[in-house]
């Protein structure tokens, strides 16, 4: 009873470039996945075992690249099922001054993913993001090895119509369809 409330106000996220007050009626949720691909029991010298022992880092990158198209859409069957942006919502989104070019300039990117027609519309869809990769050694620690493991951290951003367990199961099914065991 003490925590009962009519409203929750969160002051978070980027301000619109117009600097005008903005009401946001929800934020995307999150589901997280740790994906590991295993190779040899211990790292092996690539000069001795390259072309014989499969490299888990290469295999992991192939799994990850199979999840999205070159234009940024998740291509796992069913990922966007049930997501509907009504004409009314699209109309409201189009009234928001576009920040697409400003975001590109500020973040120093040349192109954007083509999940939707605009930034505002794109955040109405669930997303699949690789937030981290780890395998072997790089930089001053570089070694000529086939690593024993490769790991990716993935976040799936959820919208109202998204069922996190359904999306995670779709990802699992996709990975299994590539011949991997989960």
Regions found by a protein language model. Give the residues of each.
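Short amphipathic alpha-helices in soluble, non-transmembrane regions
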Residues: 167-176
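Short alpha-helix boundary/capping segments
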Residues: 48-55, 142, 146, 159
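Short acidic (Asp/Glu) and glycine-rich catalytic loops that position anionic groups and cofactors
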Residues: 39-43, 148-153, 182
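Short, intrinsically disordered, charge-balanced linker/junction segments flanking boundaries
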Residues: 1, 177-182
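A structural supersecondary motif
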Residues: 112, 118-144, 148-150, 155, ...
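Short, glycine-/Ser/Thr-/acidic-enriched flexible segments
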Residues: 14-16, 40-42, 135-137, 157-161
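Short, conserved charged micro-motifs
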Residues: 161-167
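Fold-level recognition of mixed alpha/beta catalytic cores in primary-metabolism enzymes, strongest
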Residues: 1-111, 117-126
